[in-house]
Design a protein with these regions (language model features):
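Alpha-helical transmembrane segments and their membrane-interface boundaries
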Residues: 1-260, 264-297, 305-353
Length: 353
C-alpha cells in the first residue's frame, strides 16, 4: 500500500492495518503515517476554518465548518442520481442552508418548527437518497450549526457570500470525483420516489419529526442551545431501528465521559489554554475509530464556546441534559412510530384479505 493510499484510510482502517502488520519495521511505518495523517487533517481543518473566520468574521467560523464537512463528504459520496443532477441537489441544499436557519430564528418557536420540518425534509430528500452514505450527518448537521450560531445584518451577508463560495467549491469537487457514476435516476426522481411505504421515506419522516419537535420542546422551555438536542437526535436516529439502541447508549454515556474530561481540563489548565481545548478534541476525534469516543471528543469544541457564555458548570450540565434527553426522546419516538407503522400494515393486510 502506497503512502497516499494509507492517507485515504479511515481511523478504523489504519488501526486495523497496524494491528495486522507482523513486520516491526512496516508496523512503525504505518504508525508514523497514521499519526501524520491525524495531524495533517487537523492542520487542514484549522486552516480552512481560520481562513473563513478571517474573511467572513469570527462569528461566521461555522460556515468554514459546514463547507469543510460537505467537501470531505462529497469527495467520495454521491446522491444516487446523475452527476449533473447531483449539482442541482447541491444548489438546493445550499439554498436551504442560506435561508432556512436565518428565517427560523426570526419567528416564534412553533413557526420555527414548521420551517425546520420543511427544510430538514428537503435536505433529506435531496441529499440522503443513498442511505448508506449517511449524508444526513453532514447536511442536517450543517443546518443545525448555522441555526445555532445565527448572525444578522452585515455578518449574515458575509455568511451568504461564504456559503455561495462553498457551494461552488463543493460542485467542482463533486463533479470532478463523481462524473463517471453510471446512475440514470434524475433529480426529480428523488421526489417521485417519496413513498410512505418505503423504509427510506419513513426514515426521512422520522428523523425530520424527531429533530424538529425536540428543538421545539427545548425552545418552548426557554433553554439555550436547542441545536444540541437536535444534533443528538439526528446522530442516533439511524435508517434502521435495530441500530438505534446501541447508538443511543453510546451517545448518552460517552457524552458524559467527554463532559467530565472537559471539566477536568477546564479546571486544571490555565485560562490561556482554553481556546485550544477544542483543538485537542479535534485531535482526539482523529484518533477515534468508533462513534463512542468521537462523541466524547466532539463535546470539547461545543463546550469551549458555551463555557465562555454560560460558565463551565451550567454548560456541562446543559450539554449532558440535552444529549441524554435527545437520546431518550429519539428512542421513544422510534419505538412509537415503528409500532404505529406495524399496526397500520397489519390493518391493511387484514383489509386486503
Amino acid at each position: 500500500m502506497t503512502f497516499y493510499q494509507e492517507l485515504q484510510l479511515s481511523s478504523a482502517g489504519s488501526k486495523q492495518l497496524i494491528k495486522n502488520t507482523q513486520d516491526s519495521k512496516e508496523k512503525r511505518r504505518h504508525i508514523l503515517i497514521y499519526n501524520f495523517k491525524v495531524y495533517l487533517v487537523m492542520i487542514f481543518c484549522v486552516a480552512i476554518v481560520t481562513v473563513f473566520s478571517k474573511l467572513l468574521g469570527n462569528n461566521n467560523s461555522v460556515v468554514g465548518v459546514t463547507v469543510l464537512l460537505a467537501v470531505l463528504v462529497l469527495r467520495q459520496a454521491d446522491f444516487g442520481i446523475k452527476t449533473s443532477h447531483g449539482l442541482i441537489s447541491i444548489m438546493g441544499i445550499y439554498a436551504i442552508l442560506i435561508a432556512g436557519p436565518r428565517v427560523s430564528n426570526m419567528v416564534p418557536p412553533v413557526a420555527a418548527f414548521v420551517i425546520n420540518v420543511v427544510c430538514i425534509m428537503l435536505l433529506m430528500i435531496m441529499g440522503c437518497h443513498n442511505v448508506i452514505m449517511y449524508n444526513h450527518s453532514t447536511f442536517v448537521l450543517g443546518y443545525l450549526l448555522l441555526q445555532g450560531y445565527d448572525v444578522t445584518g452585515h455578518e449574515y451577508i458575509m455568511r451568504v457570500v461564504g456559503l455561495l463560495a462553498g457551494m461552488l467549491v463543493c460542485m467542482i469537487i463533486f463533479y470532478k470525483n463523481q462524473r463517471n457514476r453510471p446512475y440514470r435516476r434524475t433529480f426529480w426522481d428523488l421526489f417521485k420516489e417519496f413513498n410512505i411505504n418505503s423504509a427510506r421515506t419513513r426514515w426521512y419522516i422520522k428523523l425530520t419529526f424527531i429533530v424538529s419537535s425536540a428543538m421545539l420542546i427545548v425552545s418552548l422551555m426557554g433553554l439555550p442551545r436547542a441545536m444540541w438536542i437536535g444534533i443528538a437526535c439526528m446522530s442516533v436516529c439511524l435508517p434502521f431501528s435495530k441500530d438505534v439502541d446501541k447508538r443511543i447508549g453510546n451517545r448518552a454515556l460517552f457524552n458524559v465521559v467527554g463532559c467530565a474530561i472537559f471539566a477536568v481540563m477546564y479546571i486544571v489548565l490555565p485560562e490561556s489554554m482554553y481556546p485550544y481545548i477544542g483543538m485537542i478534541g479535534g485531535i482526539g476525534v482523529g484518533y477515534s475509530a468508533g462513534y463512542a469516543w468521537q462523541t466524547a471528543f466532539n463535546t470539547f469544541g461545543a463546550l469551549s464556546i458555551a463555557a465562555g457564555l454560560f460558565g463551565m458548570p451550567y454548560a456541562v450540565a446543559l450539554r449532558i441534559g440535552l444529549n441524554a434527553a435527545g437520546a431518550a426522546y429519539t428512542w421513544l419516538c422510534d419505538k412509537v412510530l415503528e409500532r404505529i407503522h406495524s399496526a397500520v400494515q397489519a390493518k391493511n393486510v387484514s383489509v386486503a384479505e
